[in-house]
UniProtKB/Swiss-Prot annotation:
Produces ATP from ADP in the presence of a proton gradient across the membrane. It is found in: Cell inner membrane. It comes from Nitrobacter hamburgensis (strain DSM 10229 / NCIMB 13809 / X14). InterPro entries: ATP_synth_F1_dsu/esu (IPR001469), ATP_synth_F1_dsu/esu_N (IPR020546), ATPsynth_dsu/esu_N (IPR036771). Gene3D superfamilies: F0F1 ATP synthase delta/epsilon subunit, N-terminal. F-type ATPases have 2 components, CF(1) - the catalytic core - and CF(0) - the membrane proton channel. CF(1) has five subunits: alpha(3), beta(3), gamma(1), delta(1), epsilon(1). CF(0) has three main subunits: a, b and c. This is ATP synthase epsilon chain 1. The lineage of its organism: Bacteria, Pseudomonadati, Pseudomonadota, Alphaproteobacteria, Hyphomicrobiales. It comes from the Bacteria.
Length: 135
């Protein structure tokens, strides 16, 4: 399988840089996979699980929004937050969801809609974390 260069950057660090077979990205308009030779595109990403496949081995990383750019040079993801599943404190993640739920009562209108959407994304990540495929 042909490979391409992939960089995953967050404000804290360069999380990943190297040649990969495939990257599956949680896009705002829907999830999408990137392979070598993918057409150029810029897309917003939503909170979700990004999967990097190298040599047939998947590596899963939680991203909490950002931007993905596919160019002739490869794929670059600028993530608001990027944490490998192994590094995630699941109890803290559950506490974050509980806190988000508690704060919903303080929101109104479009602010409430955005908060509900973000909460739904976090709950989706939590659900995926609880599946055996990620362990």
């Amino acid at each position: 399988m042909a490979t391409f260069h992939f960089d995953l950057v967050s404000p804290e660090k360069l999380t990943f840089s190297g040649d990969v077979d495939q990257v599956d990205v949680p896009g705002v308009e829907g999830d999408f996979g990137v392979l070598a030779g993918h057409a150029p595109v810029v897309a917003a990403i939503r909170p979700g699980i990004l999967t990097i496949t190298t040599g047939g081995t998947p590596q899963k990383i939680i991203v909490l929004g950002g931007l993905a750019e596919v160019s002739e040079k490869g794929l670059t993801v600028l993530a608001d937050v990027a944490t490998s599943i192994q590094e995630l404190d699941r109890a803290q993640f559950a506490d974050t969801i509980a806190s988000m739920e508690a704060k919903l009562a303080e929101k109104e209108g479009s602010e409430l809609d955005k908060a509900i959407e973000r909460l739904d994304h976090f709950k989706s990540i939590q659900s995926q974390l609880n599946t055996t495929a990620l362990h």
